[in-house]
Design a protein with these regions (language model features):
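Structured helix-beta-strand junction loops
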Residues: 1, 16, 26-27, 51, ...
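Flexible hinge/capping segments at coil-to-helix
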Residues: 1-3, 7-29, 123
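Generic structural signal for secondary-structure transition and capping sites
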Residues: 3, 29, 76, 134-137
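Residues embedded in well-ordered beta-strands
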Residues: 4-6, 12, 78, 96, ...
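Secondary-structure junction motif
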Residues: 17, 21, 27-51, 119, ...
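Hydrophobic hinge/microswitch elements
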Residues: 32-98
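C-terminal effector-binding regulatory domain of bacterial HTH transcription factors
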Residues: 68, 72, 83-93, 102-145
Length: 145
């Protein structure tokens, strides 16, 4: 799943229609709740190292609404969200979702199945997923390739 930058209206990148990951260099991306040693933390650490920005994990993780409130009010913090993830926020938040391209960072997902599962839909799903190719250049960490 492609990721996007989510910012408030006062963030320096808020007016961008799209960004490259390299354009995030020097910025702080707030990801509260990322726990060291998890695949999610490793993904974001590798992404930050590849493109020169900082992943900020400090602060409490009280859920989506407080995260959106903080991002809306901050001129310095942004966060990452999945392109397919839908949020509802108050209109006065004026949050901005900015796609990342060249390359597009994508969350690594895996399909795990049991070899003894004969369900025909599973074979059809695997065949379908094997035909999908991204329309743009993508970035995933080396350990997920």
């Amino acid at each position: 799943e492609p990721i996007e930058l989510l910012t408030g209206p006062a963030h320096p990148l808020a007016a961008a229609r799209t960004l490259t990951p390299a354009q995030l260099a020097g910025h702080r991306i707030w990801m509260p709740g990322n726990v060291a040693g998890t695949e999610w933390a490793a993904f974001y650490d590798d992404l930050a190292a590849a493109f020169g920005f900082t992943i900020e994990v400090t602060g409490p993780d009280f859920g989506t609404e407080p995260l959106l409130d903080t991002i809306a009010d901050s001129p310095l913090l942004g966060t990452f969200v999945g392109a397919q993830t839908r949020f509802v926020w108050p209109a006065d938040h004026d949050l901005r979702r900015i796609p990342l391209h060249d390359p597009t960072p994508v969350y690594p997902h895996s399909l795990v199945w049991r070899g003894d599962n004969p369900h025909p839909a599973l074979a059809a799903l695997r065949a379908h997923l094997g035909t999908i190719r991204p329309a743009r250049e993508t970035w995933t960490p080396k350990w997920a390739r």
